[in-house]
Amino acid sequence: MGEAPAVLVDHPENGHSNGVCVKSEPENTEITVDVGDRIFLIGGTHERNNFSIGVQIYDKISNNWFSPIVLGTGPKPSKGYSAFVLEQGRILVIKKGSPRNDSIWFLEVDSPYVREQKKLLRKEVVAWSKGVRGNAEKPIVISGPSGVGKGTLISMLMKEFPSMFGFSVSHTTRSPRSMEMDGVHYHFADKKVMEKEIKDGKFLEFASVHGNLYGTSIESVEAVTDSGKRCILDIDVQGARSVRASSLDAIFIFVCPPSMKELEDRLRARGTETEEQIQKRLRNAEAEIKEGISSGIFGLILYNDNLEECYKKLKNLLGLDGLAHVNGVEIEGINLPIEYAVSKMEDKIIIQETGKETRNKIVVDISSLNGGAPGRTRGILVDAIKF
């Protein structure tokens, strides 16, 4: 890629970022951001994905350019960008001329998630995270052995609070069965595509079952949250372990039977399985209960000895007793003016409209950010000031 571009860098002490726009062609706007001993070139298109912004890194010590592994679903190319270096190894990127729900993004270059991925992949890594206004209720991970009643508890939640909870739609590489609809029962995916997305860090958890992949994508969980609902994930202990290791901030609940004898009685009462199948389920359940209680994955343990009482305890743990549903998530993004200048003052980004007869401002407060790559970054507060 050649030598590093000569750029002018605004000084942070003047209240401005060190992000500067550089144009090689009218429709190929790029921006450079100086972070320590590296320069990040953001813009153009990704070398393997023409629908995502490209990222290149220039190392000042070795005087070399290189392409990092880019994790997460990245933003589409735009007509221009403004960028600011934030704490926790993040770069705030504001896209010019973009739809209101696609204007704010974060490129993580040295966050805890990125550092962990660097260790795992043994390569240079960056990760994209979409910025979202407001906050949302934490997703709920519910695990427990087969026959413990967790499915019934979830159904009771969904029936009593239909507008509050939602399920993420899982991905699978198996073929659709009769009456199954893509995007409703599963997202039916090509195996090579799903394998690549798993490698790119786009899945919270996955497993191979009889030669087919099954998994929960980060985007499917975020889509439920974006709709204003609280996502419920009904997954096994291994899946919960993967979610716990991710950046998703969730509540982890494990449901236990009152005893193995009670669990065996429930399985036999179904009348749908052979003796061999029942014994296999009991062996698996015993191992799963042991791991669920002692692994440290689950912060909350429920014993389902009485369904109604267990459900009351579940609602109490989730803060649902006598409370109306209030969700602070807002996904509409920000309406940016056509022409504007951007500056930074402490934890606030000031977007100043630059028309002839206007002094309107948009103040973006980033003091309460939470979440992050490879999911959404939430907690953005916006205040419009009109003159």
From Swiss-Prot:
Coiled-coil segments on the chain, per record: none
Active-site residue numbers: R177, R270, R281
Guanylate kinase-like domain residues: 137-319
EC number(s) per entry: 2.7.4.8
Reactions performed catalytically: GMP + ATP = GDP + ADP
Annotated GO MF terms: ATP binding; guanylate kinase activity
Domain of life (superkingdom): Eukaryota
GO terms for biological process, alphabetical: gametophyte development; nucleotide metabolic process
Keyword ATP-binding annotated: yes
UniProt entry keywords in alphabetical sequence: ATP-binding, Kinase, Nucleotide-binding, Transferase
Effect of deleting the gene: No visible phenotype under normal growth conditions, but the double mutant atgk1 and atgk2 is lethal.
Family matches, as PANTHER family: GUANYLATE KINASE, GUANYLATE KINASE-RELATED
Assembly with partners or alone: Monomer.
Known role: Essential for recycling GMP and indirectly, cGMP. Required for normal development of the gametophyte and embryo, in association with GK2.
Protein name per Swiss-Prot or TrEMBL: Guanylate kinase 1
Gene name of the encoded protein: GK-1
